Amino acid sequence: MTASERELIKETVADFVEREIRPAAAEADETQTFPEDVWDGLAELDLTGLTVSEEYGGFDADQVTYSVINEELARGDLSVATALSVHCLATACIERFGTDEHKSEWLPEMVNGRPVGAFALSEPDAGSNPREMTTEARREGDEYVINGKKQWITNGKRAGVIVLFAKTDRDDPDSITQFLVPKGTDGLEVGKKEDKLGLRASDTTSLRFDGARIPEENRLTEVGSGLKAAFSILTGGRIAIASQAVGVAEAALRDAIEYADEREQFGKPIADHQAISHKLADMATDVRAARLLTRDAAEKNEDGVDPMAASMAKYFASETAVDVANEAVQVHGGYGYTKDFDVERYYRDAKITTIYEGTSEIQKEIISRHL
């Protein structure tokens, strides 16, 4: 894709963000309700098929374009961007590891926005170390019987299909395998929606499997290949989260600049006071550095998986989002501590980018191992 084509896509998404996403974000956050009409709009723009090839009607975005789109969406509402990126994780798994039958059955409809996809890897006692998962998919004849619990599942209630990671032998950490579990499967129970600090419009739930049965053909990967598959997918996922973190930081920066230009104290705009102007300069520099690091990781991932570049981007961009959102609240003073201004939401939303799809601490572990 050429730079001019990518810029046109960015402008199209940015226009949708301004018209549809940003106006709905505050209410969606307040009511903890996902804006389904926005999701339908994403589907109309073909964004629900970002990681799907053209063969199945998808957008087939390259890594840099995927990064640009994630940044723009998160600038409008991180909840929407997160829901889409997890849906795209699910479609990427089906595209990369599924059979032709899997792809034909699921991808064309998922490209059109329904069913929504979920990605079930984390568990209550197995977050940063998935090898400790206890969910088991035991083979019985031509079926797998699933027992266990998953935690922190984005799109948990909305999902029509779940990409599930489970051990075929609970005592064997090398037996982790990837499966497809459709909504409505007997023995699958979706837990209550988590009441979170931020990302409140995105539904995050637990999933409980109690003797849930799926046919053998719903196995996506070879037995024991699920974790390797997950890590290969999550490298791109971390770049998406880094991009979203840049989007949140950019939104906070823009709002801070606008407020500083309008708010007057001591007879002039606060932007003309060095204490504020230098703060804005630091924020702008950090946002640009995070964006460049993230785009570099995306370019490297286009040529082949580069875990260190992805982890550097995810670590730096997410910490930048937290810092810039914090400073944006500070620029707004007391007003920034109220829901009347979006920086309050950015401040709450930014924190999750340092946690999901690998904490900042895990990113530093990955970086240090590759030095």
What are these regions (language model features)?
Residues N147-V190:
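A short core secondary-structure module
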Residues L89-F97:
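Helix-loop "lid/cap" segments that line or gate small-molecule binding pockets
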Residues M1-G76, V80, F97-H102, E109, ...:
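Alpha-helical interface subdomain recognition
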Residues T135-R138:
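A structural signal for short hydrophobic beta-strand segments in well-ordered beta-sheet cores
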Residues E132, G184-R213:
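Flexible, small-/acidic-enriched active-site or ligand-binding loops
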Residues M110, D125-S128, W152-N155, K167-R170, ...:
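Short Gly/Pro-enriched turn/cap motifs at secondary-structure boundaries
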Residues R208-A229:
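A short, charged helix-loop
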Residues G113-L121:
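A short, Trp-centered hydrophobic/proline-enriched beta-strand micro-motif
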